[in-house]
Amino acid sequence: MTELAGASSSCCHRPAGRGAMQSVLHHFQRLRGREGGSHFINTSSPRGEAKMSITSDEVNFLVYRYLQESGFSHSAFTFGIESHISQSNINGTLVPPAALISILQKGLQYVEAEISINEDGTVFDGRPIESLSLIDAVMPDVVQTRQRAFREKLAQQQASAAAAAAAATTSASVSQQNPSKNREATVNGEENRAHSVNNHAKPMEIDGEVDIPSSKATVLRGHESEVFICAWNPVSDLLASGSGDSTARIWNLNENSNGGSTQLVLRHCIREGGHDVPSNKDVTSLDWNTNGTLLATGSYDGFARIWTEDGNLASTLGQHKGPIFALKWNRKGNYILSAGVDKTTIIWDAHTGEAKQQFPFHSAPALDVDWQNNMTFASCSTDMCIHVCRLGCDRPVKTFQGHTNEVNAIKWDPSGMLLASCSDDMTLKIWSMKQEVCIHDLQAHNKEIYTIKWSPTGPATSNPNSNIMLASASFDSTVRLWDIERGVCTHTLTKHQEPVYSVAFSPDGRYLASGSFDKCVHIWNTQSGNLVHSYRGTGGIFEVCWNARGDKVGASASDGSVCVLDLRK
């Protein structure tokens, strides 16, 4: 595996779902207090030996980061607003990924160590009877039971040791009378022990033939926080990535590039006191224009920005009153469309940086947008509605209703005739501008559907002789391929073990890449549904994407890494 350290130059992602964290939020909201101020929590050990002060701001920030990293971005946003995360003085770029989990693990180890200490201060000699869960660790009855079990096992060990010593004394003369037989038993005992270890069941692994070798994987290092999104330049092998470290980066993967500079760092700054200072906000969305000369980024600081391909800031677009969740260029390249938590969508003039029109039709945060053509687009929201709007019109030209929970993503098919939507209500719906109700209401996933993608096949594509497909990725750890003409699922792809955040078709539509929080990128044959390539990274995968030639897959991860898989033979 090649690792590029990446020299700095001078210069959407929105994980969904929230139900599972409601009790956690409730607990920490109580801790924070009704006004959201910073409170001190004084703690000490049971023996009163050590004291520490923990501010609720610190606890809130770690919970907020945990929600983001685990994909509960709606919950993270709500919790961040109520706990005033943006007003805290914590520099998020200095906090490592999985910080809350790390602290919890250390606390769990402390409790296990405490259980293992006897009343006389000696340490119990032996492994825990069984592993201690996080819930067990906070329940006094369970801890006391474990301590009693430890003491009982210690007593048994002491009794067994005494009996063994007595038996050893009795058999000593027998051993001396037949030393060769004793040595033989010892040697065989070692052999049997080794055989027993090697005979343990191993976790099932993917067939070695599909594993992508490390020589075909390049890991790009440089980001200092999780990388939410990545996108290939449509013309050249430049890979853009957006991170929680308040930067986007452009990685040059062209084979003829000199190896001196592996990345351009696009620092997202805001103006304070006449100076540019880091925004310390996540870069949540990015998109290249059609000819690959400009990159647009959206940030939690509420600004969209346009950058040149060599990393220079061309313009800053500021009219949203809160984080930007999604951002897209139109095909012509003259307009940029953005969706914000302020419940609005905005069309921007890419040349002047001015807002052409703001659309305030949603009653809750807008989560995703997609252009139907150069003037018309669709938007979806946590308000469960989908609006189709057109530049110059002061009201939606169409509104689709039918989902019973937040609508996470929307995508027009290549012809612009059909609109697909997916939701936390576990359904996938297909809409037409010709009717009010959905054409298909597809129900097969058993958890929230996070994202969807149409294949680049069928009418209005460069692959007109191949049937069009739709892929859906869900928190149920599966990916499904759909025949939309018949309204049926043709393949269920089940190798992932954790929520699937991203899917992407190869340019010819023959392959599908999927990325999951299980750290795996899988490449599937879309006709057979077979797994053809697999790669396990070092962090949960937020985004996967194909380059224009279809021979490389980029993936962004929760540990700050960006991986490029070379699929050429």
From Swiss-Prot:
Q: Which residues carry this modification: Phosphoserine?
A: 175
Query: Where, per the database record, does this protein carry N6-acetyllysine?
Result: 153
Question: What is the purpose of this protein?
Answer: F-box-like protein involved in the recruitment of the ubiquitin/19S proteasome complex to nuclear receptor-regulated transcription units. Plays an essential role in transcription activation mediated by nuclear receptors. Probably acts as integral component of corepressor complexes that mediates the recruitment of the 19S proteasome complex, leading to the subsequent proteasomal degradation of transcription repressor complexes, thereby allowing cofactor exchange.
Q: Cross-link Glycyl lysine isopeptide (Lys-Gly) (interchain with G-Cter in SUMO2): which residues? A: 332
Q: Where is this region: Disordered?
A: 170-195
Give the organism, scientific name: Macaca fascicularis (Crab-eating macaque)
Q: What is this protein called?
A: F-box-like/WD repeat-containing protein TBL1X
A GO molecular function annotation here is: transcription corepressor activity
Looking up Pfam families in the UniProt record yields: LisH (PF08513), WD40 (PF00400)
Give the record's GO biological process terms: negative regulation of transcription by RNA polymerase II; positive regulation of canonical Wnt signaling pathway; positive regulation of DNA-templated transcription; positive regulation of transcription by RNA polymerase II; protein stabilization; proteolysis; sensory perception of sound
